Amino acid sequence: LASASQFSKVGKIINADPERKFVVPSAPGKRNDKDTKVTDMLYACYALAKEEKSFSSALKKIKERYESIINGLHMKLSLDEEFKTIEKNFAEKAGEDYAASRGEYLNGIIMANYLGYEFVDPADAIRFDEDGNFMPEETDKLLKKRLKGVERAVVPGFYGAKADGTIKTFSRGGSDITGSIVAKAVQADVYENWTDVSGFKIADPRIIKNPEGIDIITYS
């Protein structure tokens, strides 16, 4: 979901099957080999804020990434208020987890508006304890309650929150975890995980040319 064209492609995939009711997006990744993932841009931006250095220019570049997606999709959507809040929270040292999570949060807002789905902030339903450990049972209960009666929703991946509202993230790539959590909560028949590579490979296709696929894999 790094560009407007990718959003359009994902939108077509989702709309191709009316049973695809709950969508869990990640933050914008690289548009090309020389590009930077938005999550890394957010980490770098917050590092400046943490060191009491000016971070307005770095934050502006992040905002421009999202605006290029919105403009490319010809949407009437403004993220001005969201970025004002982010700027304020960065200045108040809201934490690295908060900073990193904004990538998914903002992409979720765009995706929800693009699809016409309800936006559900995982900070309200995916719960971590005071030590930062994921609480599966509490999360399942909260998510079931939050999504009850919701026909279609976008739930950003990668993060949740402690009971006091402090944002906590999973490890990098945690949107896949969020997807499985949401699938369980809504008792989905199928959980589909779409990435830029089809299936499981025995090696990284960016390093090894045409690696063989793994047709069946066990898990525990």
Residue ranges of each PLM-predicted region?
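Nucleotide/pyrophosphate-binding catalytic subdomain
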Residues: 1-220
